[in-house]
């Protein structure tokens, strides 16, 4: 309720929180209210896939930030005087991109930023969402209670615990299984697990050397007589 009220009463506001905390549900409610008040909704995301997911979640037309910037600036008119811009996954937006966005808008356009400041930072310079939140100059409501649903993997709860600096009560939880393995056995363990479902497995390593060794061992396991491609 606080997040909905904040988004409706402030010209610029943020709705933040980790996965599974209900950002999409809150945003859907806010946008329905704005639409009922006569606002034209402009919803954008950084990538095409993210824009598609946003459309599926909120039911309003969405586009990429790049496409929005190629179109005419968003400004009031006699036909449509009220506009709202929603920027999803805004933790991924760097400073130059945000500058281009705000200069593409009339000052009367309302803005809602959504995202998780604890996710990966932007590739370019500037951590816009984190800086906005830390400044306290823009209204922000953080959703910090994971709404676990039936069939949940448990990953949001697990990551939220780690984000708080706490050790999860159980290292294996939900769909997460922790294999206690000595360093010299990590590659063998990964190879064994990979063999169980090679086409549905992604292995992530901490170093390039480890990734190289894992790739080599998995290739030997799945395609022992294969030839390396030369470029």
Model regions: which residues?
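ASCE P-loop NTPase motor cores of helicases and related translocases
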Residues: 1-85, 92, 133-148, 155-178
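Conserved helicase motor core of P-loop NTPases
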Residues: 2, 6, 117-231
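Short hydrophobic/aromatic beta-strand immediately N-terminal to the Walker A/P-loop
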Residues: 13-16, 112, 202
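A short acidic, amphipathic alpha-helical/loop segment
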Residues: 30, 97-101, 217
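Helix N-cap/beta->alpha junction signal
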Residues: 47, 94, 205-208
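Residue-level marker for buried hydrophobic side chains located in beta-strands
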Residues: 85, 111-113
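Walker B catalytic acidic pair
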Residues: 88-89, 115
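Short, conserved "post-DEAD/DEAH" coupling segment immediately C-terminal to helicase motif II
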Residues: 95-109, 127-132
């Amino acid at each position: 309720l606080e997040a909905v009220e904040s988004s409706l009463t402030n010209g610029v506001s943020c709705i933040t929180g980790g996965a599974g905390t209900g950002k999409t549900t809150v945003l859907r409610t806010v946008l329905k209210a704005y639409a009922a008040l006569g606002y034209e909704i402009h919803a954008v995301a950084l990538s095409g896939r993210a824009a598609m997911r946003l459309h599926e979640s909120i039911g309003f037309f969405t586009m990429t930030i790049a496409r929005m910037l190629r179109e005419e600036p968003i400004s009031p008119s006699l036909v449509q005087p009220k506009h709202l811009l929603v920027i999803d996954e805004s933790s991924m937006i760097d400073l130059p991109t945000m500058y281009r966005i705000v200069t593409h808008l009339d000052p009367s356009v309302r803005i809602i930023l959504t995202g998780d400041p604890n996710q990966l930072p932007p590739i370019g310079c500037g951590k816009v969402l984190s800086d906005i939140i830390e400044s306290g100059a823009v209204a922000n409501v953080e959703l910090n209670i994971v709404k676990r649903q039936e069939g949940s993997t448990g990953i949001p709860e697990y990551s939220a615990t780690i984000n708080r600096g706490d050790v999860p009560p159980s290292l294996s939880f939900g769909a997460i299984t922790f294999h206690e393995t000595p360093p010299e056995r990590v590659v063998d363990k990964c190879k064994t697990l990979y063999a169980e479902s090679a086409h549905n497995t992604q292995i992530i390593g901490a170093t390039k050397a480890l990734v190289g060794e894992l790739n080599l061992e998995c290739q030997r396991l799945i395609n022992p007589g294969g030839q390396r491609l030369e470029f």
